[in-house]
């Protein structure tokens, strides 16, 4: 076959295949264009999840008839200065979106330039039959996309169910709406309003907070730490959830670079590292984090859909993000999720009666109904029986030394002033019940002490080496490639301080002679394989932190107070005071709460008071 030039329509369809994967891709490109046009209001209408119809309307600057003709040609844009290609501040800049979408659909664009007398309209079918006519329209632009992928039936065949495609579009709109709280957004599907976000015109922090409440929810804000971190060429702001408020998936993690939503592996790893001391590996924090960086230090032109970025100094960015998140979490290190207490109260209101053993319905002939009360007239008012009260008052009381009683009362009053209150009782030798001025607190003694031990051992490992145990038979670990073996060998001195002694054994193998004493039952093969993976994929800091976490968790769990151990009042109060003075004592090492606080007003509501 001879080499030949492709037709313009074929080129556009190929470009569409790179940029336009599904209806959500169309919505993303067109809404981003509307944002770049300076819109304050953007409305999206869909039919059949966008397969039949997509309409995007905005009140932006609009276009003239000449601009309409140029806009649907490839590589035409108003957003890119050729002399400064690296200094990009807009969403779009390649000039590919409109012609790519037009090539695979039936497109109608109606637009009126701000201050102009007339509106104009252009119609394209499969990218052809371009015709500009005079029309009637308000200032701004409306783009209608019908029969998406009609020109590429193979792509249409691979679209998912309407529900799945719609969910992808909703996700796209939420991300763009989060990045632009000053703009109003609405999304309607088959005449049903799905999203409606009102634009905010207050200060930036208030605008962002309200938009996050609209998109992610009020519970998130109540259980999130505010991030405000700045360097001369870098700033990070947003909200990230406290460890006890987490999810089973990462779908509520929103990350932005210069207001551009991205899914970047480096940023996701940084997020994981920031939380690895506080969350189990199968749990994920929620966040909406915005990184502002000099455009010349980040390349957004590495992916057709601009969903990925490349940093000039990725390690610097990663470390700053980890530091910013940890600083924010430290400010809320003693707080547990507000939803935990509400969930507990809900269980009180609706006990799991179905899980209780069934009770025989047989009743004794002499038994009375549980709610039996003697009949009395509505006007009846009981009067106090003073004689009975006097009799009760004369009953003997336990003989308690007055001085001891006063001392205990004084100590209780002092302890009640603390955040976790004064210890009152121990339930099932597992849970500490304490009282504050306006609540009761239930503390899991094992989880709490494990966290305290974890933090103490972490501090110890910063200055001291771990006790090592020599293996009777050294373990030889064969790795997939030489690069991973080299990564381990290059970090052998740091691993030695953590109790791991190893040497190279051939090109792709490592021989382990000593391990941390506390990890006597560890699977050495798996430990070394995991370390090698983390060192090669994520870098030295993350891999070594993973090992420290593993060792520290084992120590903390082994030496912590066990459930089932009886504690004195002094021991319980001492544990509570330690928790108040220890960072991140509100959750165990797996993100579960160490205590639950029930407010007195909520308890009173349970009893209808």
Curated annotation (Swiss-Prot):
GO terms for molecular function: ATP binding; ATP hydrolysis activity; ATP-dependent DNA damage sensor activity; mismatched DNA binding. GO terms for biological process: mismatch repair. Keywords: DNA damage, DNA repair. The keyword Methyltransferase does not apply. Belongs to the DNA mismatch repair MutL/HexB family. This protein is involved in the repair of mismatches in DNA. It is required for dam-dependent methyl-directed DNA mismatch repair. May act as a 'molecular matchmaker', a protein that promotes the formation of a stable complex between two or more DNA-binding proteins in an ATP-dependent manner without itself being part of a final effector complex. This is DNA mismatch repair protein MutL. It comes from Rickettsia felis (strain ATCC VR-1525 / URRWXCal2).
